[in-house]
Amino acid sequence: ASDVYKRQVSGDMIGYWKYYPVESENGVNWGKVPVWGMADIVESKCNGVEVGERIYGFLSMSSEVIMRPGKMKAASFVDMAEHRKPLPELYNGYSRTEGEPALYKTLENERCLLFPLFITGYVLADFLADNDYWGAEQVLIGSVSSKTGFGMAAFLNSETNFSGKLVGLTSPGNKAFVESLGDCQPTHKKIAPSN
């Protein structure tokens, strides 16, 4: 919910309204709020996209979405609508769910909630690794109990060659959860008073 709210509030600044724009009324521009979700193809005029297919991707919170599929692959396609071409392809790609592991079908809600933010954690960790951590001996992750935060910690801990100290910040209520993940250095009770 907080991620959806962020998109609503920052739609103009970050460009989220550009994915599913709406004609302006009286000089006021509008947009449909995008979310990561699942959709069923109910009509298709595109060879290779069949009615009844289920897809996963960055969708509009609306009853229907019109796309221009391109870059077709067995497991995916990209929405090639003209207004989306300058936008990051990560948000324009759609996975076809038909050939995916059966487990994915049972975890659709979790996939929509967790995958995008966990992937963001991977991208952040990979960015640090690609830049050799700018020589840092310590990485501090704010809100390490968030989906992006613990994803980043997990990837820094297991997928990169970071040999420094990994420190995560969290609230007292999330301390046990963060410690159970085992990706950060031991946490402390408090680093500053909360008042």
Regions found by a protein language model. Give the residues of each.
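NAD(P)H dinucleotide-binding glycine-rich loop of Rossmann-like/cofactor-binding domains
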Residues: F58-E137
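Short Gly/aromatic-enriched secondary-structure transition segments
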Residues: K6-Y19
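Mid-domain Rossmann-like dinucleotide-binding core that forms the NAD(H)/NADP(H) cofactor-binding site
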Residues: L103-K190
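Short, small-residue-biased leader/transition segments that mark boundaries at the very start
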Residues: A1-Y5
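N-terminal basic, amphipathic alpha-helical segments
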Residues: W17, E25-N29, G57, M61
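Non-transmembrane, aqueous-exposed alpha-helical and coiled segments at domain scale
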Residues: I191-N195
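A glycine-/small-residue-rich N-terminal strand-loop-strand element
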Residues: W36-E64
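Short, basic/aromatic beta-hairpin or loop at an interaction surface
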Residues: P21-A39
